[in-house]
A protein has these predicted regions:
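Ferredoxin-reductase
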Residues: 2-82
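Short cysteine clusters
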Residues: 216, 221-224
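Conserved small/polar residues in nucleotide/adenosyl-binding loops
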Residues: 228
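Short glycine/proline-enriched turns and hinge-like loops at secondary-structure junctions
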Residues: 18, 32-34, 98-100, 219-220
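FNR/FR-type flavoprotein reductase catalytic core
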Residues: 72-213
Length: 228
């Protein structure tokens, strides 16, 4: 785990509220893997903001983070430019390592999609992906997923992009009971509960990355600890 200021190499606005930063942080990138996150200090705010790591480039010493503006802290982040520095603590969290010996299905919902991009890339070109969004205007990273996975299914609540419905509507038709597959998912808690329940019903292994408000990011304050 490291805590220092790292330079932003590039920024991209993905939609009206979502931004992507590529950050130069060689030692942090070297210690990162799928499902981990960083805690970013936002100006004069006391508490850091937890942001998932979307992509990791160990060779070039960079990570990509994708975040949605939800308050003053992330609004401050969205106003940063290439060349600015961010005070970052990380990498944090347990994460996971995709099992390449089994069929890999990666499911992202909303702002839970970015960490699944890095996971699908790590798994390889046989990755299968299901993405869920509220509407077409909320969709992000769809082209990037299509460039790394052999199959990408998209759902929206209102049917403006892909199939109308939820990610579980697609998943239940993609997998057979007890097949040699692993599902990896990140997104809103109701979505994760539905995905986990379906995987349990079909006797398929499932990993979920949980979203939670937190303060320290290392488990000491217990804000991010969930009972299960």
């Amino acid at each position: 785990m490291f805590q220092k200021s790292y330079k932003i190499l590039s920024t991209e606005k993905l939609n009206n509220t979502t931004f992507s930063f590529v950050i130069s942080c060689p030692e942090l990138a070297e210690e990162s893997w799928c499902g981990r996150f960083v805690n970013v200090l936002c100006g004069e705010k006391t508490l850091r903001r937890p942001i998932s790591i979307s992509e990791i480039d160990k060779q070039n010493g960079t990570i990509t983070i994708v975040f949605e503006v939800r308050g003053d802290g992330t609004k401050w982040m969205s106003e940063r430019k290439a060349g600015d520095e961010l005070d970052i603590l990380g990498p944090l969290g347990n994460g996971f390592f995709p099992d390449k010996t089994k069929r890999g299905i990666f499911i992202g919902g909303g702002i839970g999609c970015p960490p699944m991009l890095g996971a699908a890339k790590e798994y390889g070109s046989d990755a299968e992906v299901i993405l869920g969004f509220r509407s077409q205007e909320n969709a992000i990273l769809t082209d990037k997923f299509k460039s790394v996975a052999k199959r990408v299914e998209i759902t929206t609540n209102d049917g403006t992009l892909g199939a109308k419905g939820f990610v579980t509507d697609v998943l239940k038709n993609m997998v057979q009971n007890g097949e040699n597959a692993v599902v990896y998912a990140c997104g809103p808690t109701p979505m994760l509960k539905s995905v986990a329940a379906l995987c349990k019903e079909k006797n398929i292994k499932c990993y979920v990355s949980l979203e939670q408000r937190m303060a320290c990011g290392i488990g000491a304050c217990l804000c991010c600890c969930l009972l299960y």
